[in-house]
Amino acid sequence: MSGAPDNKESLKQWIKDNFLFEIDIEPSGTGNVELKIKEKGKQSHNLIDVGFGYSQFLPLIVKIWKTIYVDMPNDAAIDGDNKRKKEHFILMEQPELHLHPKLQEKLGRVLAQTVRFCNDKKYDVRFLVETHSEAIINAIGSEIAVNGLNPDSVNILLFNAKSEGMDKYVEKAYYSKDGYLMNWPIGFMS
């Protein structure tokens, strides 16, 4: 991301709109800067003084924003032959760690909305998310049911432990057009 003010303001607004907190960068007086987090209705705090989840979460959501609003438009997503020029993969390992369930749910919604946005723009952006978060999984299903995300845009692979007597190591689950999980193991979330 360039240091251009419009990019900074765009990022700040996107975070505020999608995650209901604000970020700000302030000089600290020692030649350094402080990254401030302000949750809705609360006082702003230095990143080091808020929950550990923010320090893990911010790089992830900045990467998503940068990919769809800076990288993809600059890559000219489609050439004259209607072929995708550049693929972007964003990998996430347990993004729910240290996050409040409300932020997990918002992340799930943003992932689903980003997939729909990229499909509409013909951007080749793919996410690989390893998660155990019921909030993320349910938010994606809700986006399918309520906001029209194509369920074929989401693949779910379940990795089973053969040592626990499971027949298959990898099984595929999926969402119905109504956002319901299909072929989901009974008791997985309980």
Describe each PLM feature range.
Residues G3-K8, Q13-W14, F21-W184, M189:
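Switch/communication elements of ASCE P-loop NTPase nucleotide-binding domains
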